[in-house]
């Protein structure tokens, strides 16, 4: 299965296609740059203003120029984006006039909608199985309804949304027509806090309660490219500490589970990768090669002979967890009962550090503790 990353909210400031056919029009190529906003434009502009973001660099060493300045990807309507803004990106215009009360101009269909649909249909036509849609909540849900309907009418593509605002979950599933949403703000953040002893294990109960009715639509994970590795010094410091959390998210419900590459090897993400530096993550901004994964690839053998004993141990644990999650009927289609929720006043049960639940299918019952 192949799932690719689709970034619909923003593109690089120097974006252009180096492989398009002659009849394809690049994003922004026909924009009226004298207008701050136009439904026919692909970008937002700051007319009469030049982009300024030297960040201490000398003028003679800073060759990039942009006039008029385009609005930055994180909705920064300022010609002087800060270091914490997404200054290397420009915001795409889906027909919402942010500067004038967020009035929407969706009829006729904005030019950006058609261009982005062309991109989606191109990749769907290549036979991909799914799309992980970056910062989907920053794009109008009306676009998603329209675009996903068009794509899925032609191709069996799975759509996964990166949405961090829980109040938008239901509308992005129902109206937006997404198949799954990232469970980051709820389950991931809670499990990370439990591992780091920053919150009680009983907080996990609130996670499933918050998404009751659509729990099966939440994509659970403990690592991805944006987050710090479990084994990093910024998270738990060792891979074993993440095993109980993996068991919770893999066994608790029937929702999908995602493993980030190298997670099953205990990858720490503590390399110094150029621009990113040592941050506990793996290569957000830089091309990089990870030794733990290279050792598993082992010149195309894809075996464990190049792994350390500790890496093999972690990998085998992950294999067992995933095998149970895929084959046990009580996990794949069973009922769920939260035992921690039922034992809040039980003095023999430590709700601060323990979490327990039951799964049941026909006569099969599983206790997870």
Located regions from the model:
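The substrate-binding groove and active-site-proximal loops of carbohydrate-active enzymes
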Residues: 1, 13, 88-112, 128-138, ...
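Substrate-binding/active-site clefts of carbohydrate-active enzymes
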Residues: 1-122, 170
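Loop/turn elements at helix/coil->beta-strand transitions in domains of secreted/extracellular proteins
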Residues: 1-3, 126-131, 155-157, 216-217, ...
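Aromatic-lined carbohydrate-recognition surfaces of secreted/lumenal glycan-active proteins
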Residues: 3, 11, 137-140, 144, ...
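Active-site groove signature of glycoside hydrolases
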Residues: 8-11, 116-139, 220, 224
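Short catalytic/ligand-binding loop motif for oxyanion handling, primarily in non-cytosolic enzymes
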Residues: 10-18, 139-142, 167-171, 228-231, ...
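Glycan-recognition surfaces
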Residues: 153-234, 238-240, 247, 251-254, ...
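Loop/helix patches that line or flank the sugar-binding groove of alpha-linked glycan CAZymes
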Residues: 224, 229-369
């Amino acid at each position: 299965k192949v799932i690719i990353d689709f970034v619909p909210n923003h593109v690089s400031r120097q974006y252009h296609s180096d492989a398009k056919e002659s009849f394809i029009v690049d994003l922004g190529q026909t924009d009226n740059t004298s207008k701050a906003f136009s439904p026919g434009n692909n970008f937002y502009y700051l007319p009469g203003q030049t982009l300024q973001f030297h960040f201490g660099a000398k003028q003679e060493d800073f060759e990039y120029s942009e006039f008029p300045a385009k609005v930055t990807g994180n909705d920064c309507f300022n010609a002087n984006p800060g270091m914490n803004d997404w200054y290397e990106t420009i915001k795409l215009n889906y027909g919402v006039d942010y500067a004038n009360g967020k009035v929407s101009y969706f009829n006729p269909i904005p030019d950006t909608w058609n261009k982005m649909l062309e991109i989606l249909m191109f990749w769907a036509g290549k036979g991909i199985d799914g799309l992980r849609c970056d910062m989907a909540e920053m794009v109008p849900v009306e676009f998603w309804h329209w675009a996903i309907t068009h794509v899925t009418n032609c191709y069996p593509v799975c759509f996964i949304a990166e949405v961090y605002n829980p109040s938008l979950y239901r509308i992005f599933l129902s109206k937006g027509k997404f198949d799954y949403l990232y469970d980051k703000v709820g389950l991931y953040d809670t499990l990370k806090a439990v591992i780091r002893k920053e919150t009680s294990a009983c907080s996990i109960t609130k996670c499933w309660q918050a998404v009751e009715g659509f729990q099966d639509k939440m994509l659970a994970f403990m690592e991805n490219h944006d987050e710090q590795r479990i084994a990093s010094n910024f998270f738990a410091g060792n891979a074993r500490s993440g095993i109980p959390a993996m068991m919770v998210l893999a066994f608790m419900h029937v929702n999908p589970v995602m493993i980030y590459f190298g997670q099953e090897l205990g990858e720490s993400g503590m390399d110094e990768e150029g621009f990113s530096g040592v941050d506990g993550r793996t290569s957000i901004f830089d091309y990089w090669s990870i030794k733990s994964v290279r050792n598993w690839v082992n010149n195309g053998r894809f075996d464990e002979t190049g792994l350390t004993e500790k890496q093999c141990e972690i990998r085998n644990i992950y294999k067992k967890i995933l095998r149970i999650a895929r084959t046990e009927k009580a996990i794949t289609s069973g009922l769920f009962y939260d035992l921690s929720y039922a034992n809040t006043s039980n003095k023999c049960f430590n709700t601060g550090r323990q979490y327990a639940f039951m799964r049941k299918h026909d006569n099969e019952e599983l206790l997870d503790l």
